[in-house]
């Protein structure tokens, strides 16, 4: 942003005097009413001033004698006062700083006529004093940030463009004999040839400071962060793949659980059946040494009441029986004999006992002895006795 130009008080005085001299020069010249500009081409706001000034200046030219030439008399005194440029640090607190370019007093401009022949000097006020005030105000405010009073070239007009003709709004009231034309409302967007209209940017107020934040620190590890993010993305994809595989095998896990449940039920059934077998075929109790059981075995008398079954064997045993009068007598007179058993296929029972001996007997000599007995057995009772012996040896 370019720096604004600065001017001293003397330079401002010279510029103001030069502008006022230019205004005096153009206002003091005679104006031909017939060659003056038309009312329609004069900007609104100063039409009456320029019209009255032109008509007033045209009357002496047409009727009176030739006026003498005018010569501007420059006075050494300053017609206005410039605001004192007091340093800001010497002002009281919360005191606004005055603008040194704005005058404190604005006296009305004066016109001086000098007759060269007679040397008479006449003074009077300007006929177009309003126009002089307008030019003076423009000169005073052109070096400041304040917006000019004049409506010409306003920044609020979006169709304003430097170098082009200003587009003014339609006048609501009539001027003289001219009336308002209510015609087409379509306006040309360009007022100077083929150059398109460019909206002027709004002026920035000097009273609104710009808030500036500190610049962010430079990111020196951007590449490392990007590589880290890529690695995390790759790991996330791997985890997602594994999760998909786990979800795919969830059905297999459910099937395995169902099979385990059925196996547990089967094992429980087998345990119940084994318990039933132990109850039906009792043997030695558990957690009892075999030596103690063998010591407790001894011969005892057995009393049989009633007729004996065919499976009972009483060979080479002294028996005492009861006669008809219920008197005990030795068995020498009467011997109980076993009834012959019917022939039965014992192959399956022998194979079962051989497998039982192989599974339950750990010592090879004992195992061989039981296998020999099983093969030599011819009746079911012998096989049952061998079975009991195998179970006792296994405990």
Swiss-Prot record:
Asked if the keyword Ribonucleoprotein belongs to this entry, the reply reads no
Which residues does the annotated region (Multimerization) include? 220-283
Region Disordered, residue ranges:
178-217
Q: Can you say where in the cell this protein is located?
A: Host cytoplasm
Stretches with biased composition (Low complexity): 206-217
List the coiled-coil residues.
none
Q: Name one GO cellular component term.
A: host cell cytoplasm
Keywords associated with the record = Host cytoplasm, Phosphoprotein, Viral RNA replication
Q: Name one Pfam family in it.
A: Paramyx_P_V_C
User: InterPro entries from the entry?
Assistant: P/V_Pprotein_paramyxoviral, Soyouz_module
Entry-linked Gene3D superfamilies = 1.20.5.300, DNA helicase RuvA subunit, C-terminal domain
Q: Its quaternary structure? A: Homotetramer. Interacts (via multimerization domain) with polymerase L; this interaction forms the polymerase L-P complex. Interacts (via N-terminus) with N0 (via Ncore); this interaction allows P to chaperon N0 to avoid N polymerization before encapsidation. Interacts (via C-terminus) with N-RNA template; this interaction positions the polymerase on the template for both transcription and replication. Interacts with host ARHGAP26; this interaction promotes host RHOA activation. Interacts with host KPNA1 and KPNA6.
What's the family? Belongs to the rubulavirus/avulavirus P protein family.
Domain commentary: The N-terminus consists of a long intrinsically disordered tail. The central part contains the coiled-coil multimerization domain (PMD). Forms a four-stranded coiled coil structure. The C-terminus constitutes the alpha-helical domain that binds to the nucleocapsid (N-RNA complex).
**Physiological role:** Essential cofactor of the RNA polymerase L that plays a central role in the transcription and replication by forming the polymerase complex with RNA polymerase L and recruiting L to the genomic N-RNA template for RNA synthesis. Also plays a central role in the encapsidation of nascent RNA chains by forming the encapsidation complex with the nucleocapsid protein N (N-P complex). Acts as a chaperone for newly synthesized free N protein, so-called N0, allowing encapsidation of nascent RNA chains during replication.
Q: What is this protein called?
A: Phosphoprotein
> What is the source species?
Human parainfluenza 2 virus (strain Toshiba)
């Amino acid at each position: 942003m370019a720096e604004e130009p600065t001017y001293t008080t003397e330079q401002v005085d010279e510029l103001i005097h030069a502008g006022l001299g230019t205004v005096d020069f153009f206002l003091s010249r005679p104006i031909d009413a017939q060659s003056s500009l038309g009312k329609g081409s004069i900007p609104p706001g100063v039409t009456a001033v320029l019209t009255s000034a032109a008509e007033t200046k045209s009357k002496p030219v047409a009727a009176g004698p030739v006026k003498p030439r005018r010569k501007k008399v420059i006075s050494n005194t300053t017609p206005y006062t410039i605001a004192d440029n007091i340093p800001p640090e010497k002002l009281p607190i919360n005191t606004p700083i005055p603008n040194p370019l704005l005058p404190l007093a604005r006296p009305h401009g004066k016109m001086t006529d000098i007759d060269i022949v007679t040397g008479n000097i006449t003074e009077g006020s300007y006929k177009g004093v309003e126009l002089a005030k307008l030019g003076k105000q423009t000169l005073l405010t052109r070096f400041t940030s304040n917006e000019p009073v004049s409506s010409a070239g306003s920044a609020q007009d979006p169709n304003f463009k430097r170098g082009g003709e200003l587009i003014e709004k339609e006048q609501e009231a009539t001027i003289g004999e001219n009336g308002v034309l209510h015609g087409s409302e379509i306006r040309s967007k360009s007022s100077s040839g083929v150059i398109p209209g460019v909206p002027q940017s709004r002026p920035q107020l000097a009273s609104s400071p710009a808030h500036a934040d500190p610049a962010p620190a430079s990111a020196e590890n951007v590449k490392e962060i990007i590589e880290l993010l890529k690695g995390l993305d790759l790991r996330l994809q791997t985890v997602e793949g594994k999760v998909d595989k786990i979800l795919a095998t969830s059905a297999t896990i459910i099937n395995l659980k169902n099979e385990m449940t059925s196996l547990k039920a089967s094992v429980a059934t087998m345990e119940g059946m084994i318990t039933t077998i132990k109850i039906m075929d009792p043997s030695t109790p558990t957690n009892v040494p075999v030596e103690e059981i063998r010591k407790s075995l001894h011969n005892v008398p057995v009393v049989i009441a009633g007729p004996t079954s065919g499976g009972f064997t009483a060979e080479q045993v002294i028996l005492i029986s009861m006669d008809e009068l219920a008197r005990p007598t030795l068995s020498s007179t009467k011997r109980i004999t076993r009834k012959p058993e019917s022939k039965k296929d014992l192959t399956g029972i022998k194979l079962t006992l051989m497998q039982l001996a192989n599974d339950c007997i750990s010592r090879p000599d004992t195992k061989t002895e039981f296998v020999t007995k099983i093969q030599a057995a011819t009746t079911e009772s012998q096989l049952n006795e061998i079975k009991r012996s195998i179970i006792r040896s296994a405990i």
